[in-house]
């Protein structure tokens, strides 16, 4: 192996006339392939673009110091150093034999951008395509709001004294019912739409959405929401914050319930006013009044909030009042209730008593559900 390398070195020097150290440099760079080394030598311009940088020997160094090594560098190496920053973005480069021109170059996968760089690209791309920065929505204490243009009607003054002023109606802005306003919030680890869930920057399903934002376009999924209307998209920068899911808006209870306080709450069906009036008239006609006997008027306060007034004879019994209530409110037939006086508050338990015996002449009776 050593003999083959020595033979290649001699041939390289014989062909190019270069010094042995320089010949060895090109052969080592080409993996000791003579043809590749010669091609690299002539492509680099031979003697014209080779600079030998020798390390100066300090005067204070003694004779016993080991001789310094020479480093041979081409101008191409200097250019390569200037391009290192660009190569970092493109991916790491690998060389499989030969020089930069004659060998095979392999470029690795591009370096992934951090979320901070990704957000920068989104804002930069949006601005390049016409997006503008707006003031924050919230105002500090004492901060005045921006004036809004007048949108009402007014009077156009006449151009001459004899011309009368004319009223001019203001033009109303037409807003489509399909217009959509969306807030895109860019967080440290992802993005969200309005008060929605966090969506990752690295999720492939979100790549098309983010690319549309970077190009200054409205993403397709937002256009579908508008159904042909206008989409207003606001972008908020929260890249230094972790995603926090907003609290849901308070919703008042809209269901049904029962009022506390009654021993056995019941739901009573109500009829239409016309049907109710018909039932009350039928109930009143069912009470037979003997005009030759003394009469009295009884006021009845019903459990459903209604009020009935009926004429009775003194000889009518409390049970007749119960029947009258059931006829006036047929829904009460299947409901358990009692009758009570208002003052003093006492239950009328013995319904066989007459109104006179129970001292209910011209009285007020209350119905209570049980």
Curated annotation (Swiss-Prot):
<feature type="modified residue" description="Phosphoserine">
    <location>
        <position position="74"/>
    </location>
</feature>
<feature type="compositionally biased region" description="Polar residues">
    <location>
        <begin position="261"/>
        <end position="287"/>
    </location>
</feature>
<dbReference type="GO" id="GO:1990730">
    <property type="term" value="C:VCP-NSFL1C complex"/>
</dbReference>
<feature type="modified residue" description="Phosphoserine">
    <location>
        <position position="140"/>
    </location>
</feature>
<dbReference type="GO" id="GO:0005795">
    <property type="term" value="C:Golgi stack"/>
</dbReference>
<dbReference type="GO" id="GO:0046604">
    <property type="term" value="P:positive regulation of mitotic centrosome separation"/>
</dbReference>
<feature type="domain" description="UBX">
    <location>
        <begin position="291"/>
        <end position="368"/>
    </location>
</feature>
<feature type="modified residue" description="Phosphoserine">
    <location>
        <position position="176"/>
    </location>
</feature>
<dbReference type="InterPro" id="IPR001012">
    <property type="entry name" value="UBX_dom"/>
</dbReference>
<dbReference type="InterPro" id="IPR009060">
    <property type="entry name" value="UBA-like_sf"/>
</dbReference>
<dbReference type="InterPro" id="IPR036241">
    <property type="entry name" value="NSFL1C_SEP_dom_sf"/>
</dbReference>
<dbReference type="GO" id="GO:0000132">
    <property type="term" value="P:establishment of mitotic spindle orientation"/>
</dbReference>
<feature type="modified residue" description="Phosphoserine">
    <location>
        <position position="192"/>
    </location>
</feature>
<feature type="region of interest" description="Disordered">
    <location>
        <begin position="261"/>
        <end position="289"/>
    </location>
</feature>
<dbReference type="GO" id="GO:0005694">
    <property type="term" value="C:chromosome"/>
</dbReference>
<dbReference type="GO" id="GO:0000045">
    <property type="term" value="P:autophagosome assembly"/>
</dbReference>
<feature type="short sequence motif" description="Nuclear localization signal">
    <location>
        <begin position="109"/>
        <end position="115"/>
    </location>
</feature>
<feature type="modified residue" description="Phosphoserine">
    <location>
        <position position="114"/>
    </location>
</feature>
<feature type="region of interest" description="Disordered">
    <location>
        <begin position="54"/>
        <end position="116"/>
    </location>
</feature>
<feature type="compositionally biased region" description="Polar residues">
    <location>
        <begin position="54"/>
        <end position="73"/>
    </location>
</feature>
<feature type="modified residue" description="Phosphotyrosine">
    <location>
        <position position="167"/>
    </location>
</feature>
<feature type="modified residue" description="Phosphoserine">
    <location>
        <position position="272"/>
    </location>
</feature>
<dbReference type="GO" id="GO:0005813">
    <property type="term" value="C:centrosome"/>
</dbReference>
<dbReference type="GO" id="GO:0008289">
    <property type="term" value="F:lipid binding"/>
</dbReference>
<dbReference type="GO" id="GO:1904780">
    <property type="term" value="P:negative regulation of protein localization to centrosome"/>
</dbReference>
<protein>
    <recommendedName>
        <fullName>NSFL1 cofactor p47</fullName>
    </recommendedName>
</protein>
<dbReference type="Pfam" id="PF08059">
    <property type="entry name" value="SEP"/>
</dbReference>
<keyword id="KW-0539">Nucleus</keyword>
<comment type="subunit">
    <text>Part of a ternary complex containing STX5A, NSFL1C and VCP. NSFL1C forms a homotrimer that binds to one end of a VCP homohexamer. The complex binds to membranes enriched in phosphatidylethanolamine-containing lipids and promotes Golgi membrane fusion. Interaction with VCIP135 leads to dissociation of the complex via ATP hydrolysis by VCP. Binds ubiquitin and mono-ubiquitinated proteins via its N-terminal UBA-like domain when bound to VCP.</text>
</comment>
<dbReference type="GO" id="GO:0043130">
    <property type="term" value="F:ubiquitin binding"/>
</dbReference>
<dbReference type="InterPro" id="IPR012989">
    <property type="entry name" value="SEP_domain"/>
</dbReference>
<feature type="modified residue" description="Phosphoserine">
    <location>
        <position position="102"/>
    </location>
</feature>
<comment type="similarity">
    <text>Belongs to the NSFL1C family.</text>
</comment>
<feature type="short sequence motif" description="Nuclear localization signal">
    <location>
        <begin position="172"/>
        <end position="175"/>
    </location>
</feature>
<keyword id="KW-0597">Phosphoprotein</keyword>
<comment type="function">
    <text>Reduces the ATPase activity of VCP. Necessary for the fragmentation of Golgi stacks during mitosis and for VCP-mediated reassembly of Golgi stacks after mitosis. May play a role in VCP-mediated formation of transitional endoplasmic reticulum (tER). Inhibits the activity of CTSL (in vitro). Together with UBXN2B/p37, regulates the centrosomal levels of kinase AURKA/Aurora A during mitotic progression by promoting AURKA removal from centrosomes in prophase. Also, regulates spindle orientation during mitosis.</text>
</comment>
<keyword id="KW-0158">Chromosome</keyword>
<feature type="domain" description="SEP">
    <location>
        <begin position="179"/>
        <end position="244"/>
    </location>
</feature>
<keyword id="KW-0446">Lipid-binding</keyword>
<dbReference type="Pfam" id="PF00789">
    <property type="entry name" value="UBX"/>
</dbReference>
<dbReference type="GO" id="GO:0006511">
    <property type="term" value="P:ubiquitin-dependent protein catabolic process"/>
</dbReference>
<dbReference type="GO" id="GO:0005737">
    <property type="term" value="C:cytoplasm"/>
</dbReference>
């Amino acid at each position: 192996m050593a003999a083959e390398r020595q033979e290649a070195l001699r041939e390289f020097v014989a062909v190019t006339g270069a010094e042995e150290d320089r010949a060895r440099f090109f052969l080592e760079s080409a993996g000791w392939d003579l043809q590749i080394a010669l091609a690299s030598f002539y492509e680099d311009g031979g003697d014209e673009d080779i600079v030998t940088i020798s390390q100066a020997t300090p005067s204070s160094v003694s004779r016993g110091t080991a001789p310094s090594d020479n480093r041979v560098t081409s101008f191409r190496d200097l250019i390569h150093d200037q391009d290192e920053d660009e190569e970092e973005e493109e991916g790491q480069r690998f060389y499989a034999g030969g020089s930069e021109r004659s060998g095979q170059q392999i470029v690795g996968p591009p370096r992934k951008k951090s979320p901070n760089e990704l957000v920068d690209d989104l804002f930069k791309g949006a601005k390049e395509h016409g997006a503008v920065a707006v003031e924050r929505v919230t105002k500090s204490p004492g901060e005045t709001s921006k004036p809004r243009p007048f949108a009402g009607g007014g009077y156009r003054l006449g151009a001459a004294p004899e011309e009368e002023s004319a009223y001019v109606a203001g033009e109303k802005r037409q807003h489509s019912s399909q217009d959509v306003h969306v807030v895109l919030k860019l967080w440290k680890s992802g993005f969200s739409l309005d008060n929605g869930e966090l969506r990752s920057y690295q999720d492939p399903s979100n790549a098309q959405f983010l690319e549309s934002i970077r190009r200054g376009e409205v993403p397709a999924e937002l256009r579908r929401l508008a159904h042909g209307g206008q989409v207003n998209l606001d972008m908020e920068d929260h890249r230094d914050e972790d995603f926090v899911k907003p609290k849901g808006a308070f919703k008042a209870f809209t269901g049904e319930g029962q009022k506390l306080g009654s021993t056995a709450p019941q739901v009573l069906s109500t009829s239409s006013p016309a049907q109710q009036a018909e039932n009350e008239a039928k109930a009143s006609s069912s009470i037979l009044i003997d005009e030759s006997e003394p009469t009295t008027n009884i006021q009845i306060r019903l459990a459903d909030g209604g009020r009935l007034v009926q004429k009775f004879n003194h000889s009518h019994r409390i049970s007749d009042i119960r029947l009258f209530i059931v006829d006036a409110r047929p829904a009460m037939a299947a409901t358990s209730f009692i009758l009570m006086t208002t003052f003093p508050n006492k239950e009328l338990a013995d319904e066989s008593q007459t109104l006179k015996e129970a001292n209910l002449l011209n009285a007020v009776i209350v119905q209570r559900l049980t």
